[in-house]
């Protein structure tokens, strides 16, 4: 059984008790310069009329600067990959480092060994370069020359159709159909269950949605090749990449926020999870743990203005 686990936070405030009068009274002492420097450091965020300047908060922080928000730059191995793909290129991936849908396309590019440029965008500011491709301002978006397209599964299919690099879809028509069927299962059932579980605030709902997610993953595992370690055998293919970002986030998000259990030792599911975690393309596009903890706190607290995904899940609609 899955159990909810509360995550607590600690807020520390510090106030200066040094008045201008006390500073003047101690001007004859050698410490005065240090005190003035300290006073300046503490109060440099004050405006000229003595009022404290407000830090610009992201909308999903709910007006509380102690709340964590999404990261705007990759970290760890993913940051190294961003740097190595920062030069201008005809093939551009526009993404946000915390987004699992971006993660899919990014893994695909790395798996195939294609030459591309990664462009980090702030989807909550919706820059024009993104809106020119996707009027809804969502990521991932891909520009290839003067042509652009969006939606993660569509982009993965497009990269396959380029017929460059290592393929993700098998050559056998039956296995291709099998892969597309279970990719659809991931999009229709596993991903919504993931967000329902993460966003649920009532402990009973968390247990129910956790069970739903476990059940939907179980169906996928039953459809997988019995030997593995990947979905249809020894090599990573389309279904693996479709699921990989959420396998990463089971460990980095659901485990700390909802107590998601480790795979049962020796199980087919454990074998699959470990293969995904050890895959080079996955590792090269995955940031450090803190990025995911911070970026998904808003989902775990079900805050307003978090994302269109959050709104769709709360209203019972399909994913945007």
Go through each PLM region and give its residues.
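GST-like domain detector, emphasizing the conserved glutathione-binding G-site
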Residues: 6-18, 24-27, 36-231, 300-304, ...
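Residues at alpha-helix termini
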Residues: 112, 133, 254-258, 280
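Short alpha-helical "patches" and their helix-cap loops
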Residues: 170-173, 207-211, 256-271
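Short capping/connector residues at structural and topological boundaries
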Residues: 173-174, 235-236, 287
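Surface-exposed helix-capping loop/turn segments at secondary-structure junctions
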Residues: 222-234, 256-257, 279-286
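GST superfamily/GST-like fold recognition
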Residues: 233-256, 264, 268-271, 276
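A contiguous, mid-protein "functional segment" used to position or interact
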Residues: 263-297
């Amino acid at each position: 059984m899955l159990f909810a686990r509360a995550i607590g936070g600690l807020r520390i405030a510090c106030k200066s008790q040094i008045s201008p009068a006390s500073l003047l009274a101690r001007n004859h002492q050698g410490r005065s310069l240090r005190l003035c420097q300290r006073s300046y450091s503490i109060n440099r965020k004050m405006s000229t009329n003595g009022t404290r300047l407000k830090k610009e908060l992201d909308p999903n922080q709910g007006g509380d600067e102690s709340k964590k928000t999404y990261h705007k730059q990759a970290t760890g191995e993913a940051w190294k990959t961003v740097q190595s793909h920062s030069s201008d290129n005809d093939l551009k991936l526009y993404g946000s480092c915390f987004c699992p849908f971006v993660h899919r396309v990014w893994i695909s590019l790395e798996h195939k060994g294609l030459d591309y440029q990664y462009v980090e965008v702030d989807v909550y500011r919706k820059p024009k370069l993104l809106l020119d491709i996707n009027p809804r301002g969502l990521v991932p978006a891909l520009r290839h020359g003067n042509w652009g397209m969006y939606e993660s599964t569509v982009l993965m299919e497009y990269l396959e159709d380029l017929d460059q690099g290592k393929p993700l879809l098998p050559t056998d028509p039956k296995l291709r159909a099998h892969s597309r069927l279970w990719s659809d299962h991931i999009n229709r059932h596993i991903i919504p269950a993931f967000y329902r579980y993460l966003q649920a605030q009532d402990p009973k709902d968390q247990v129910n949605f956790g069970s739903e997610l476990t059940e939907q993953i179980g169906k996928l595992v039953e459809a997988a090749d019995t030997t593995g370690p990947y979905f249809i055998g020894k090599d990573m293919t389309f279904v693996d990449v479709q699921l990989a970002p959420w396998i990463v986030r089971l460990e980095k998000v659901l485990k700390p926020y909802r107590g998601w259990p480790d795979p049962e030792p020796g199980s087919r599911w454990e074998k699959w999870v470990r293969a995904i975690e050890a895959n080079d393309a996955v590792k090269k596009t995955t940031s450090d743990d803190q990025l995911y903890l911070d970026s998904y706190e808003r989902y775990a607290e079900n805050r307003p203005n978090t994302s269109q995904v959050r709104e769709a899940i709360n209203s019972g609609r399909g994913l945007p």
